[in-house]
Amino acid sequence: MDNHTKEQRHDNMSHIRSVSKPEVIVRKYLFSQGFRYRKNDKRYAGKPDIVLPKYKTAIFVNGCFWHQHPECSKAVLPKSNTDYWLPKLEKNVLRDKTNIAILKQEGWNVIVIWECMLLKKKREETLKKLKKDIEDNLKLN
């Protein structure tokens, strides 16, 4: 049962935006390194957050809770309204797996960056690895 009226829920949800801080961090880094990309390109399965056509690479910047990052403390199932949350989160995970499989089958390099990997203590290492993975994929193709 929802604790809010329909109007309150609508107002709350209308303030949620698709652009997240982790996504902005990744995009700014890629641009600073000379990569040019497309955002949320609908032509590709799952509408990846970032698409680098030249490198045939699709990047998903996933929130640990929403996409249920395995073994992450941020991916805890809420204690209330579990009848709603469990199926919703399971559906998100299944959709992610399906979209990644489709992209890989089409020959794309798929990189998933988790929100927790962009915290300050891991950010530099994560972004350097991202750059290396993108460049390595170009060499393979």
Residues covered by each model-derived region:
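Nucleic-acid endo/exonuclease domains
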Residues: 1-112, 116-141
